[in-house]
């Protein structure tokens, strides 16, 4: 399978390397299977013969025209953590060759894959419109505001939709590369994951910091603070809206617009986050922790913890 990996100035070093390393490992381990899949023939392409990564390393590339021969185009992330600078880059002249390459690959029916901030380049090129996608959890409010036509689910680690596969934050590149291997051979993907000591991570929820998301909107940030001060109490949305000086409808819309979820779900996320913190840092029983975060029955909290983190309570203990 011919794979073209798009490199550009400022590309995230670990993202670029992860794709190569996982696919190289898969190639090295193919013969360990009775029925190995075809090898992955990986080529790094770019608008310039040499690009400088985010960490300052120089990477040689082949011309962008090689994408015409590719059976898969992979777009690693940009090493940029500032939302304003990220948007400026993916919408600016520096990324125009990359956007064109992505759009042409999509028009030709070539599958495309990307992770973390690289998903912004795909969205800017228009290939995610009307489709499901994920991105870095902490950039979800920015992504959702700029690309409203994309059905964003930042809780997922890997999302595939209409020939485009997206993955979550930073080291989600490993999950993305494993999904590429898994598409051809689940057995080989399992083997590679074991050798690289990589756990399956279907969700980003366990890594999400609710306050980092809420801070993108003043109303949501105020609601978060209001809820955190009352985690052990029943939460009333009308009371919260009254205390914050907004209508209940305005509060609901602000939460939905910023977080892509309901106020009730956000309150649950805050309670689960605090419960997980107490499990890691204290010796309190689950019953005591449940009461501290507003649940009468520990079984309810147990189910929510497993749902949000994908882990049993025992594994969350420090």
Role assignments for model-derived ranges:
Residues 70, 109, 130-131, 161:
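Short, well-ordered alpha-helix to beta-strand connector turns
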Residues 46, 154-156:
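Short loop/edge segments at beta-strand edges and connector loops
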Residues 112-113, 134, 153:
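Structural detector of well-ordered beta-strand residues that form the stable sheet scaffold
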Residues 119:
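Active-site segments of SGNH/GDSL-like serine hydrolases
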């Amino acid at each position: 399978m011919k794979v073209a990996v798009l490199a550009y100035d400022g590309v995230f070093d670990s993202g670029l390397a992860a794709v190569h390393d996982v696919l190289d490992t898969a190639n090295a381990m193919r013969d360990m299977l009775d029925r190995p899949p075809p090898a992955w023939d990986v080529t790094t392409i770019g608008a310039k013969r040499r690009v400088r990564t985010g960490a300052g390393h120089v990477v040689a590339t082949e011309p962008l025209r090689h994408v015409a021969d590719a059976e898969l185009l992979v777009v690693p992330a940009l090493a940029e953590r500032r939302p304003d600078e990220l948007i400026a880059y993916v919408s600016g002249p520096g990324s125009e060759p990359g956007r064109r390459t992505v759009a042409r690959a999509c028009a030709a029916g070539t599958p495309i894959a990307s992770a973390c901030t690289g998903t912004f380049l795909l969205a800017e090129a228009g290939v995610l419109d009307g489709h499901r996608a994920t991105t870095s959890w902490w950039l979800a409010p920015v992504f959702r505001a700029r690309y409203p036509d994309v059905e964003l689910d930042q809780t997922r680690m890997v999302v595939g939709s209409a020939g485009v596969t997206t993955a979550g934050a930073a080291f989600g590149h490993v999950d993305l590369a494993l999904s590429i291997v898994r598409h051809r051979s689940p057995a080989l993907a399992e083997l590679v994951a074991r050798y690289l000591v990589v756990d399956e991570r279907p969700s980003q929820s366990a890594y999400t910091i609710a306050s980092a998301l809420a801070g993108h909107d003043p109303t949501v940030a105020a609601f978060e603070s209001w809820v955190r001060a009352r985690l052990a109490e029943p939460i009333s949305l009308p009371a919260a809206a009254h205390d914050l000086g907004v209508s209940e409808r305005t509060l609901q819309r602000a939460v939905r617009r910023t977080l892509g979820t309901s106020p009730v779900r956000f309150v649950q996320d805050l309670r689960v986050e605090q419960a997980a913190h107490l499990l890691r840092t204290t010796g309190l029983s689950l019953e005591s922790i449940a009461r501290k975060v507003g649940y009468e029955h520990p079984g309810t909290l147990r189910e929510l913890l497993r749902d949000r983190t994908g882990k049993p309570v025992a594994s969350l203990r420090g």
